[in-house]
Amino acid sequence: MGAGLAVYRGLTWGLGLVLPAAAGLGRADGAWRGALTGASAEGAASAGSIWVHAASMGEVGAARRWVDALVEAGVRPPLLLTTRTRTGLERARREMPGRVAARIAPLDLPQTVRALLESACPSRLDVVETEVWPNLILEARRARVAVVFVSGTVSARTERRLRALGVAGPALLGNGVFALARDDEAAARFRALGIPEARVRVAGDLKADFPSPAAVPAEGERVAVVFGSFRPGEEATALAIAEALHGMGVEEGRPATPPARPLLVVAPRHEEGAARARRLFAGAGYAVFERGAAERSVETLPAWLSRAASGARTRVAILSTHGELPEAYDHARVAIVGGTFAPFGGHTPLEAASRGCPVIAGPYHDAVARALGAIARDGGAAIAPDPASAAAVAASWWRDGGFAARSQAALRAARSLGGAARRGLEALEAWRLVP
């Protein structure tokens, strides 16, 4: 074991002796208390099954497709699913009832990870995308539980951080660790970090494994431009698009009915984003429609969108609920890819593309470059260098009559990138990791 890894183990072991005493300071149902808990009812309920770990809400969405594939392949539910955020936990429990026993992931302390492994006795640990936590991996290996990175990706920043900390290499990622990489670049990074070539396969991106809709809504049913996964720093883009769309239709002499009047729907990535969007648009003088849990309980999303789009003054709506963004894309003529107009690397454009919705992305799209490139090559996506350009493209696409061609291009690209779950299961068979 290298010096960096030994130091990390020593420090976290010491923290594991004192931090659990602080668990009582948090709410009984809070993430803090859950993160300091090892053995749990969820572990016992899923004993002997597979442990799936997904960092946050976005990864939980990918994990859902993996869990569905595992259960359909014969894995006995419930599986254990852990996540590090409250919103991720809520999504897992809402979207996978009966299929997973979900809880907050333990902190990366040897004692808490070991206790959960001992209570759950998983047959395998599947880490969705990238969460390289040394104790999680080492304790799983110690318990002879294979670790598989699923839809795995390693950014250049993560690789540099692991090397700087001195925790990369076969001491961490040696025997018992496998990678189902998202693409060739990720596969090369996993190999460089210490996973042998024979235990690395390119399987693809789980976020591309979206079910094909039974029918793609026609242009006339699409009343909105949807800014999905809106992040801090993207306010200028959202405001520029709102201004470009404001007043279209009536001023151009077109009928004052949807979809002649574009509705901008902003769906924040995190809860605090709703307040930020509210302040932004209210400060600019827009009448803002908002959908939260209360509205969701009494009105369907299509009805809410139709009502917002037909309002005399409403030009902007905020979607504050969790789990409704995919359905919102069914009613969008244009999707703006969040996390690409501020340095976050981008969120998947495939969720919108798989619904037949063309996408516009900004300059910060390195994390989704492959998917975005595939959609753009056939005309289903555009890359805008700045907020003004994004607004101009959105306005042009709204009225130029090219929706059908762009929609079909986006659908074709999304379907061509699917199959990650199937290829992953085939690799597990070859590695003899199927329980």
Please give the residue ranges for each predicted region.
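Active-site and donor-binding regions of nucleotide-sugar-utilizing enzymes
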Residues: 20-212, 230-231, 245-260, 269-271
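Conserved sugar-transfer catalytic core signal across GT-A, GT-B, and GT-C glycosyltransferases
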Residues: 136, 234, 324, 347-348, ...
